[in-house]
């Protein structure tokens, strides 16, 4: 059993007040809930089943009309998940290598399980990652992920696409319904369906294995990565999503590079940090009115990547 109290970033949301008056807000939701779960491992596989009960409310200040337009309140139901992993990692590794990880998730919220009657959905998502060792600690990392939703359409969306939120210690990424596409702000698109393909070439630069005197800080290694993220988020039957011929027309491509480091803080807290640059080079016109939240500049000039945790 676990208890959770956290916030979710839904990115920029626009509220139509009528008469051409559009209000733009950066929407955060606060969530509190309890989860009871069981997991059954078998060799390199893990099967799990959980019941969750969460109360969702706005953290960002909203008017009564704006709050009523969103799908808030109680979300309760079941989550079933399958995971597989056989990737390797050694003391000199900068990344997982020589293997793969797979995750398949089904999430169901229903009023008979305690959910609000506007918050009933069936959500499926999948995530496949391959790590190919090229030479010494050089790695080619590949990822294919996506998700679909059936049932009530949440105004604020189900899947968030965009940003560089990482996974691991002190990082908040890794959720089944978040897809990082670098070159976009966090959850720049939030829809009922999403798809993402990512490729990274990861290479070592230096391995200092040094601390700062007696300070509780240790630098293990510094590495680099060149990456490309290709994805989109959309609602069912939107645009050309029902036609294979037009399906990829609105997909965006973000490319860039990152400098990465593995640190030890205190006496044993491992931290992975990333700093870099990313820019959308395909279908940039879809999001060029958005700004980099760190620099305040238009994302048509690219975005600063500053994050904790592994990209994937």
Which residues are covered by each model-predicted region?
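Active-site/binding-pocket entry motifs
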Residues: 7, 232-233
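C-terminal structured "cap/appendage" subdomains that terminate the fold
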Residues: 245-277
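Gram-negative/organellar outer-membrane beta-barrel architecture
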Residues: 1-92, 101, 173-179, 187-188, ...
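C-terminal outer-membrane beta-barrel translocator/porin domains of Gram-negative envelope proteins
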Residues: 73-228, 234-248, 286-300, 304-312
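Hydrophobic, Leu/Ile/Phe/Ala-enriched alpha-helical segments that form helix-helix packing faces
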Residues: 36-38, 132, 263
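Membrane-spanning beta-strand positions in outer-membrane beta-barrel proteins
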Residues: 46-48, 139-141, 268-272
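Short, loop-centered acidic/histidine patches that primarily coordinate divalent metals
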Residues: 227-231, 260-264, 276-280, 311
């Amino acid at each position: 059993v676990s208890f959770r109290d956290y916030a979710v970033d839904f990115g920029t949301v626009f509220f139509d007040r009528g008469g051409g008056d559009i209000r733009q807000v950066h929407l955060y939701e606060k969530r509190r809930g309890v989860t009871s779960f069981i997991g059954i491992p078998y060799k390199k596989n893990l099967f799990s089943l959980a019941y969750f009960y969460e109360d969702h409310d706005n953290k960002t200040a909203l008017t009564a009309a704006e709050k009523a337009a969103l799908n808030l309140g109680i979300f309760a139901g079941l989550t079933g998940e399958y995971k597989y992993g056989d990737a390797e990692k050694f003391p000199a590794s900068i990344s997982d290598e020589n293997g793969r990880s797979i995750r398949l998730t089904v999430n169901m919220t229903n009023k008979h399980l305690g959910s609000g009657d506007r918050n009933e959905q069936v959500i499926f998502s999948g995530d496949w990652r391959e790590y190919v060792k090229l030479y010494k600690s050089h790695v080619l990392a590949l990822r294919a992920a996506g998700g679909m939703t059936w049932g009530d359409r949440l105004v604020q969306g189900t899947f968030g696409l965009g940003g560089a939120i990482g996974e691991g210690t002190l990082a908040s990424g890794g959720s089944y319904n978040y897809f990082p596409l670098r070159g976009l702000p966090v959850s720049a698109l939030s829809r009922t369906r999403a798809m993402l393909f990512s490729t990274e070439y990861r290479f070592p630069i230096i391995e200092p294995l040094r601390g700062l005197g007696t300070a509780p800080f240790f630098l293990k290694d510094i590495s680099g990565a060149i990456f490309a993220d290709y994805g989109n988020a959309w609602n069912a039957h939107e645009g050309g999503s029902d036609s294979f011929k037009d399906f990829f027309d609105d997909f965006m491509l973000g490319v860039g590079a990152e400098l990465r480091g593995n640190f030890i803080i205190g006496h044993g807290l491992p931290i992975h940090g990333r700093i870099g640059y990313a820019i959308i080079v395909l279908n940039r016109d879809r999001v060029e009115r958005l700004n980099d939240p760190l620099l305040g500049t238009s994302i048509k000039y690219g975005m600063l990547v500053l994050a904790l945790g592994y990209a994937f």
